Amino acid sequence: MSIEVDWRAATSGPDGEALAERIRSFIHDKFQQVALPRFIRSVQVHSFDFGTIPPDLEVKDICEPFADFYEEDEDDETSDVSEELVSGHGTQWHRDLNEPPFHEEMAMNRPLRDPFDEAFHSSTLRSPMEHLNPHFLPRAGTPGIPGGTSTLGYHLMSLGGLSGTQTPLAAVAGGTPFANGWTDPGMGASSRGHPSISGPTAVHPSRMEADIDTSNPTSRPSTSSTLPSHPSASNQPSGDATTGKEHGSLAEDEHLDDPMTSGHPLRLPPRMRERRPEDFQVLCHAKYAGDVRLSLTAEILLDYPMPSFVGLPLKLNVTGITFDGVAVIAYIRKRVHFCFLSAEDADALIGSDQQEARGQDDRPWSSADPTASPKRQGGLLREIRVESEIGRKEDGKQVLKNVGKVERFVLAQVRRIFEEEMVFPSFWTFLI
């Protein structure tokens, strides 16, 4: 089934101009990241135009979208707040994140933080004092407790260069009042690890100090790591706070000693959007021999009589391309994903032109004839027509013409950018 495209309506107007400018800016940025050869100083992309000749589209298949189109982009946070994310268990996945078994299983993978944990607090240096736990850090000034009424005192003292038993690490090992309040709440230990600590316990840290037997090495918290205690300590009653700390420290040391944990941290599977019945994908055989235009300039360096003696501007005008490939257009909710398939993927999904012709003629294909190979030959961009000129025109004549080296380099980069950014698994997404 063939499709007739209103090319003028699709590429003109404010939307068409904005899309053309976006493509020009994208190609320009890619050229700034390319390692240029010695004889080229810079490459600038000035304009892009879709032309007036539309492509020929033939629908080959309508199917379900590829799974890659459902992956949640890490950078796309604001536009997906209202969308439902699933990861194997549907909507239950969000609620399971806050359950204690999830935290116990994730203890060995501490660098990954639960983004949906409501108990998480940012660093005290960045958040107002009202967000701090009033039981853990009382507002009233308590003489004798370093830091006063907030943990800001600890940060200032640590910057001042504490030494010996006054450092927070030594304070934790010795069971001093620092053991209860010096950890940054942003790490999640003070607010999530010990929610059962009551107000009197926090106001009188000497009771906590008395519960720790400093003569027994096994009862002292581990100093091999500054990571917070195991989250399972939150399930311990308030009377067994010391036992919970011991269990968390021992379990944490076991995880730190595990080579599988330290060397190869586990990663959560990518978050996936939920499939819906209205999602669909169209595979089209696209042929294009149009007059798309791309204007570039490259500055060539001349090394005579000395290195980089003078630079000459080379103007390149792409006046048309010939394209033959398979396009993928997927519609998912309010997004349209667009890309092309490589020659191998296209042959696997819809077959090649030789296979279709052989099926219509009912003639067997002979492997001895290399010209009848069913594989698609070459890249997606079959031909790029270009015009070039160097220097300024004098009396209507160009100073130099058709500098082959620069042309080949620029056109090779255009092909590379197209195949890396437009061929699956790379794709473009448009919000509609």
UniProtKB/Swiss-Prot annotation:
Residue ranges with Basic and acidic residues bias: 243-253, 355-364
Domain of life: Eukaryota
One GO molecular-function entry: lipid binding
Annotated ranges, domain SMP-LTD: 1-432
Annotated keywords: Endoplasmic reticulum, Lipid transport, Lipid-binding, Membrane, Mitochondrion, Mitochondrion outer membrane, Transport
Compartments, as annotated in UniProt: Mitochondrion outer membrane; Endoplasmic reticulum membrane
A Pfam family annotated for this UniProt entry: MMM1
Bias kind Low complexity: ranges: 214-234
Membrane topology designation: Peripheral membrane protein
Gene Ontology BP term (one): phospholipid transport
Listed CDD domains: SMP_Mdm12
Region (Disordered): 182-273, 354-377
One GO cellular component, as annotated: endoplasmic reticulum membrane
Biological role: Component of the ERMES/MDM complex, which serves as a molecular tether to connect the endoplasmic reticulum (ER) and mitochondria. Components of this complex are involved in the control of mitochondrial shape and protein biogenesis, and function in nonvesicular lipid trafficking between the ER and mitochondria. Mdm12 is required for the interaction of the ER-resident membrane protein MMM1 and the outer mitochondrial membrane-resident beta-barrel protein mdm10.
Family, as annotated: Belongs to the MDM12 family.
HAMAP family named among the record's database cross-references: Mdm12
Quaternary state and interactors: Component of the ER-mitochondria encounter structure (ERMES) or MDM complex, composed of mmm1, mdm10, mdm12 and mdm34. A mmm1 homodimer associates with one molecule of mdm12 on each side in a pairwise head-to-tail manner, and the SMP-LTD domains of mmm1 and mdm12 generate a continuous hydrophobic tunnel for phospholipid trafficking.
Domain note: The SMP-LTD domain is a barrel-like domain that can bind various types of glycerophospholipids in its interior and mediate their transfer between two adjacent bilayers.
Protein name: Mitochondrial distribution and morphology protein 12
Organism: Aspergillus flavus (strain ATCC 200026 / FGSC A1120 / IAM 13836 / NRRL 3357 / JCM 12722 / SRRC 167)
Name of the coding gene: mdm12
